[in-house]
From Swiss-Prot:
Name assigned to this protein: ATP-dependent 6-phosphofructokinase
Cofactor: Mg(2+)
Location of this chain's protein in the cell: Cytoplasm
Binding site for Mg(2+): 104
Organism annotation: Sodalis glossinidius (strain morsitans)
PANTHER family reported in the protein's UniProt record: ATP-DEPENDENT 6-PHOSPHOFRUCTOKINASE, PHOSPHOFRUCTOKINASE
Pathway as given in its UniProt record: Carbohydrate degradation; glycolysis; D-glyceraldehyde 3-phosphate and glycerone phosphate from D-glucose: step 3/4
Length: 320
């Protein structure tokens, strides 16, 4: 029977992680469990930086961005010997299970711990919305608000100067954040990792817009597709229109979480406790069709793929 659990945040931070930690702690305490926080993710787990949390440890945390437990990249966790030390640090404190909040890399760590006999539950915490087994991840909607606000501001100055603006959005190899922000921000063009990109095709579309009398434009593009500064130079050369690139960067990860992220994080945190008390381990939590669900974490990592919603992209193109 589970009596003590740990909770950590790992990988890139996202708004709502604190709300998720709070959900785990408050729900766990209400069920009579002891809850321990691990500082700086898997690195802190390896270094034995573990502390007991009470309900006051998470007071006034639901509205704060980032993660008060901290997060760190720790590639050495791939090594079995490193994980064995981490498990030893948990077992000597009497911990029975671990809740991991993070993206697919964090899930991989939880998967490996589970395979070594230590039960874990994963919660999807990333602005990229690229985790399998869930429609939305914790932090996605807050990041979306941040990106849309930036696009709105860029449109003001682009309109004033009759300029083309390129805005680079996070997402790694998932275009969800870019596509949603482009629709909400009224961007004229979208460049996504799921769709083959040729700069000359984009220039053709921009020229077509100019021919119709378009005096400015916003191009939303997901990171890692190309060098946006070089793309801006190419567009300016080919169209004769002043073109500027803006990389939003890590500002997208910060800020007070919006209401939906707070609710999603709180419900997922509490649900992880329910699953552990029911004897589940090696699961990851998600929300699908507005319902909380859970999947085998190994299956989620190895077999489940997030579907690309091409129908939304096609609809978006009709709105430009």
């Amino acid at each position: 029977m589970i009596k003590k659990i740990g909770v950590l945040t790992s990988g890139g931070d996202s708004p709502g992680m604190n709300a998720a930690i709070r959900g785990v702690v408050r729900a766990g305490l209400s069920e009579g469990l002891e809850v321990y926080g691990i500082y700086d993710g898997y690195l802190g787990l390896f270094q034995d930086r573990i502390a007991k949390l009470d309900r006051y440890s998470v007071s006034d945390m639901i509205n704060r961005g980032g993660t008060f437990l901290g997060s760190a990249r720790f590639p050495e966790f791939r090594e079995e010997g490193t994980r064995a030390i981490a498990i030893e640090n948990m077992t000597k404190r009497g911990l029975d299970a671990l809740v991991v909040i993070g993206g697919d890399g964090s899930y991989m760590g939880a998967k490996r711990l589970t395979e070594m006999g230590f039960p874990c539950i994963g919660l999807p915490g990333t602005i990229d919305n690229d985790v399998a087994g869930t429609d939305y991840t914790i932090g996605y909607f807050t990041a979306l608000e941040t990106v849309v606000e930036a696009i709105d501001r860029l449109r003001d100055t682009s309109t004033s100067h009759q300029r083309i603006s390129i805005v680079e959005v996070m997402g790694r190899y998932c275009g969800d954040l870019t596509m949603a922000a482009a629709i909400a921000g009224g961007c004229e063009f979208i460049v996504l990792p799921e769709v083959e990109f040729k700069p000359e095709d984009l220039v053709y579309e921009i020229k077509a817009g100019i021919a119709k009398g378009k005096k400015h434009a916003i191009v939303a593009i997901t990171e890692y597709i190309c060098n946006v500064a070089e793309l801006a130079q190419y567009i300016e050369k080919e169209t004769g229109r002043e073109t500027r690139a803006t990389v939003l960067g890590h500002i997208q990860r910060g800020g007070r979480p919006v209401a939906y992220d707070r609710i999603l994080a709180s419900l997922m945190g509490a649900y992880s406790i329910e699953l552990l008390l029911q004897g589940y381990g090696g699961r990851c939590v998600g929300v699908q069709n507005e319902r909380l669900v859970h999947h085998d974490i190994v299956d989620a990592i190895e077999n489940m793929k997030r579907p690309f919603r091409s129908n939304i992209l096609e609809t978006a193109k009709k709105l430009f």
